[in-house]
């Protein structure tokens, strides 16, 4: 029969107290057990058009060549993308930009060197979907819902940094953008803005890629209110 010495530490698992006494663990905000997000019907939103918005690079090869050149000058590329959600018949739908027949992307893009992530995403959202009558869109961005890294100058991205990678080439952050009850969006003519239901995205990497198809899991922590 073993006896616990009287001076033995009573901290650590399973009592919920870290054995390090919080010496190496940064204090965080109190855990939010339920995060509520208001969703509004797709019919509440008006979609106009504006001049085409073209990619900086003419091909995938050109994109990685530019990434390589910029990495040598300014380091890792920082990218932000916005997740906009509406509902139809009380089913959440994510707004996606469609280019051609098979390519889908979230609105967003590259940050400028030193640019704040949230302010940069607001700038990009305005460039891509902002209205043209001079009325500024109020983008509400409170939640980062995902991080993806590109370890090499190649297409694969991962929701973690592989163990052997010390200098990722790109860091992509996904943010939930909370929409107002009503809004007007101006969509570049070379894109379509489509509302894809979560059940279509789920486990559908062949159709939407690994990042967009992971959104149902990332969004499952929210409590949606269907207005």
UniProtKB/Swiss-Prot annotation:
Effect of residue 218 to R: Reduces interactions with CPSF6 and CPSF7 and decreases mRNA 3'-processing activity
PTMs per UniProt: Acetylated mainly by p300/CBP, recruited to the complex by CPSF6. Acetylation decreases interaction with PAPAO. Deacetylated by the class I/II HDACs, HDAC1, HDAC3 and HDAC10, and by the class III HDACs, SIRT1 and SIRT2.
Compartment annotation: Nucleus; Cytoplasm
Motif (Nudix box): 109-130
Effect of mutating residue 158 to A: Abolishes interaction with CPSF6
Pfam families: NUDIX_2
The entry's keywords: Acetylation, Cytoplasm, Differentiation, Methylation, mRNA processing, Nucleus, Phosphoprotein, RNA-binding
Omega-N-methylarginine sites (modified residues): 15
Tissue spec: Expressed in the heart, brain, placenta, lung, liver, skeletal muscle, kidney and pancreas.
Region (Necessary for interactions with PAPOLA and PABPN1): 81-160
N-acetylserine PTM positions: 2
GO molecular function annotation: chromatin binding; histone deacetylase binding; identical protein binding; mRNA 3'-UTR AU-rich region binding; mRNA binding; protein homodimerization activity; RNA binding
Protein name as it appears in the record: Cleavage and polyadenylation specificity factor subunit 5
Phylogenetic classification of the source organism: Eukaryota, Metazoa, Chordata, Craniata, Vertebrata
């Amino acid at each position: 029969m073993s006896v616990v010495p009287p001076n033995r530490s009573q901290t650590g698992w399973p009592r919920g107290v870290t054995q390090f006494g919080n010496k190496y663990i940064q204090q965080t905000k109190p855990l939010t057990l339920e995060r509520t997000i208001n969703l509004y019907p797709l019919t509440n939103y008006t979609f106009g058009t504006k001049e085409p918005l073209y990619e900086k690079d003419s091909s995938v090869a050109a994109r990685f060549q530019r990434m390589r050149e910029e990495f040598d000058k300014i380091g890792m590329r920082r990218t932000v993308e916005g997740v906009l959600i509406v509902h139809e018949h009380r089913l959440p739908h994510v707004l996606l930009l469609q280019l051609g027949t098979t390519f889908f992307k979230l609105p967003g893009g590259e940050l400028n060197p030193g640019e704040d992530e949230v302010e940069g995403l607001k700038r990009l959202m305005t460039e891509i979907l902002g209205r043209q009558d001079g009325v500024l869109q109020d983008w509400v961005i409170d939640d980062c819902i995902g991080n993806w890294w590109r370890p090499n100058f190649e297409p694969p991205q991962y929701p973690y940094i592989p163990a052997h990678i010390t200098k990722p080439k790109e860091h992509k952050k996904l943010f939930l953008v909370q929409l107002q009850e009503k809004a007007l969006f101006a969509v570049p003519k070379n894109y379509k803005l489509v509302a894809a239901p979560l059940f279509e995205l789920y486990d559908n990497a062949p159709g939407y890629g690994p990042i967009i198809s992971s959104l149902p899991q990332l969004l499952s922590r929210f409590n949606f209110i269907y207005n």
